[in-house]
């Protein structure tokens, strides 16, 4: 992904909520921390939940899995509803913003936008574009880039240098038309993880997150945040 490079966002609800507020999203839905994958910790997450973002390390093991998964889906096929809003990632370190766009775009009917919302405008203008066209559209969408840059400096840890290679990556897990989709702009298409519902989305998404952790048992750098009704 040569070309544009942004500063990475933290998987920190304060940062993501402030970012979305600046893009004109009404705070009737807010990101919250998921403190652990066990049922008693998941029970602390306010319901309903309409999306989960997972931050995870890109390791050699993961890259091997990603290649195998892609080849398997290409040979066996999968069902993906045309209702899924999916975009590719062409900007380095923009995965946090793309994860947020995926989370909001696939729950647009639940969201309230302020008048003149930058995010609402982006989603409306890109609704009929291909995933590749949406990626290009974001590259030239200065209002989102500037807001991302501001938010990247607002985290609890110091933002790395823009040239520093970052091996952490965000994906979004969302419910569309009765199925759980993993949306990752580094992948060629959405990944259908099977059936889900508004009521079981959090638990179903966390099962997918657990698989990421099981593939890399020596890694500790996993973090999940959930988009909950405020």
Swiss-Prot record:
Sorted keywords for this record are: Cytoplasm, Hydrolase, Phosphoprotein, Protease, Thiol protease, Ubl conjugation pathway
Does Nucleus show up as a keyword for this record?
no
Q: What is its main location?
A: cytoplasm
| Enzyme Commission number | 3.4.19.12
Show the disulfide pairing.
none
The knockout note for this entry states: Mice have no developmental defects, are fertile, and show normal T-cell differentiation. They have normal anxiety, locomotor behavior, motor function and synaptic transmission, but show defects in spatial learning and working memory. Exhibit stress-related effects with profound apoptosis-mediated germ cell loss and also, prominent retinal degeneration with photoreceptor cell apoptosis and mitochondrial oxidative stress. Mice show reduced capacity for adipocyte differentiation and impaired insulin responses.
Cross-referenced InterPro entries, in alphabetical order?
A: Papain-like_cys_pep_sf, Peptidase_C12_UCH, Peptidase_C12_UCH_sf, UCH_AS
Q: Where is this region: Interaction with ubiquitin. Crossover loop which restricts access of large ubiquitin adducts to the active site?
A: 152-159
UniProt tissue specificity: Ubiquitously expressed, with highest levels in brain, liver, heart, thymus, kidney and testis. Highly expressed in the cauda epididymidis, in meiotic pachytene spermatocytes and post-meiotic spematids. In the retina, enriched in the photoreceptor inner segment.
Q: Name one Pfam family in it.
A: Peptidase_C12
- Which residues are tagged with the site Transition state stabilizer? 89
Q: Which residues form the UCH catalytic domain?
A: 5-229
- Where is it localised? Cytoplasm
Q: Which residues constitute the catalytic centre? A: 95 (nucleophile), 169 (proton donor)
GO process terms (BP): adult walking behavior; cellular response to insulin stimulus; eating behavior; positive regulation of fat cell differentiation; protein catabolic process; protein deubiquitination; retina development in camera-type eye; ubiquitin-dependent protein catabolic process
Which residues lie within the region annotated Interaction with ubiquitin? 8-13, 219-224
Can you cite an annotated GO cellular component? cytoplasm
Record comment: activity regulation: Inhibited by monoubiquitin and diubiquitin.
Entry similarity comment? Belongs to the peptidase C12 family.
Q: How does it assemble?
A: Preferentially binds diubiquitin; the interaction does not hydrolyze diubiquitin but, in vitro, inhibits the hydrolyzing activity on other substrates.
**Cited PANTHER family:** UBIQUITIN CARBOXYL-TERMINAL HYDROLASE, UBIQUITIN CARBOXYL-TERMINAL HYDROLASE ISOZYME L3
The name this protein carries in UniProt is Ubiquitin carboxyl-terminal hydrolase isozyme L3
